[in-house]
């Protein structure tokens, strides 16, 4: 299973005390393939370093980069699907380039993808993805 994880979802999941932590743990341990691009990775890094402990941020980024289960993509096409927040296009573009099964986000800006026939991107909330990966582990 391949997934692109929205920055805010990844941010809450890297905290070991968060109930969403399995999203991060399963990404680096092979529960699913985390799909990232350089622009997503840079956004993760920027947000993490601003919002959490610097060491935790650096460790999380390194874990994602060096995990053999992380798949890196360099989207060649910008589909410009997220008109409400064009900065979020990097996530949908990566999901399309990766052929990801899911784009995981609680952000309403991605609702437009539910109405887009092509290219198709399945957006699911963090809670649903969490339940999916937890049930897969059991």
Task: Please tell me what each predicted stretch does.
Residues 89, 108-138:
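Acidic, PIN/NYN-like endoribonuclease modules and their adjacent C-terminal/linker elements
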């Amino acid at each position: 299973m391949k997934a692109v994880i929205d920055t805010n979802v990844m941010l809450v999941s890297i905290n070991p005390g968060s109930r969403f932590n399995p999203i991060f743990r399963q990404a680096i341990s092979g529960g699913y393939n985390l799909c990232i691009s350089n622009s997503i990775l840079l956004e993760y890094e920027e947000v993490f370093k601003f919002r959490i402990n610097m060491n935790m941020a650096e460790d999380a980024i390194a874990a994602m980069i060096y995990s053999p289960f992380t798949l890196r993509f360099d989207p060649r096409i910008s589909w410009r699907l997220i008109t409400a927040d064009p900065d979020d296009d990097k996530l949908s573009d990566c999901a399309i380039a990766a052929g990801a099964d899911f784009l995981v986000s609680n952000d309403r800006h991605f609702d437009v993808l539910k109405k887009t026939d092509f290219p198709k991107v399945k957006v699911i909330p963090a809670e649903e993805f969490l339940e999916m990966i937890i049930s897969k582990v059991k």
